[in-house]
Every structure is written in structure tokens, then in C-alpha cells.
Amino acid sequence: KTILIMGSTSDEPHAKKITDQLDEYGIEWEQHAASAHKQPLKVLEILEDNKEKDNIVYVTIAGRSNALSGFVAANSEFPTIGCPPFSDKADMLVNIHSTLQMPAKPLF
């Protein structure tokens, strides 16, 4: 199962691209909007609600500083895939760089 966590509802168009592909491959998913900056307890609640489940992958959708990806990865044992939205190549580079430099606890 894939659990998408968006930083805000403004990320829904980007999330739809992902969920359309998940639907195409028959992969079950659920979607939430919760900011690591503004609603960290809500993010933790989502993670807590799913910690006993099997075969979970988190997809985080947040731009700019993208604390969401690192926050989810650091607080869950499940894989986390950061998939930031972007509007152009410059925005893509900022978002990818931010996603890659966010710290998370190692799995090993």
C-alpha cells in the first residue's frame, strides 16, 4: 500500500499524477495533507496509525524546504520516497536539492 502525504492541499494536482499511475498498476493508496512545519503532530498520527501494517511505502509531496520527507523517513521504519512538485527546471533543482539534503535516520 502506498500512503501519500502532501504538505498541503495545493499539492493535489501533483499527487493525482502519482495516484493515476498507482491505479493503473492496481496499487492501493490513501492520501493525506499534513505539513511537517505546521502540523507535525498530524503527520506523526498518520505514521502511528500505519506502523503495525505490512508493505507500506510513503510518498511525500512537499516543495521548497521539504521537511516532510525527512520527517516521515526519520519517524517510520517504512521506505519514504520524496516526490516534490515543481513548476520549471529551476524550481525542480531547488526542490530536488532540498529533498536530497534532508536528514533522516539510517535504516541499518
Task: Give the residues covered by each predicted segment.
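Glycine-rich phosphate/diphosphate-binding loop of Rossmann-like nucleotide-binding domains
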Residues: 1-36
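Solvent-exposed, flexible loop/coil residues
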Residues: 16, 72, 100, 104
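Glycine-rich phosphate-binding loop
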Residues: 46-85
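A glycine- and small-aliphatic-rich helix-loop capping segment at beta-alpha/alpha-beta transitions
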Residues: 21, 75-82, 99-102
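N-terminal beta-loop-helix "entrance" segment that forms/cooperates
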Residues: 27-52
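Structural motif
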Residues: 1-4, 30, 56-58, 78-82, ...
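Short, glycine-/small-residue-rich phosphate/pyrophosphate-handling segment
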Residues: 88-108
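Short glycine/serine/threonine-rich phosphate/pyrophosphate-binding segments
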Residues: 11-16, 40-41, 62-71, 89-93
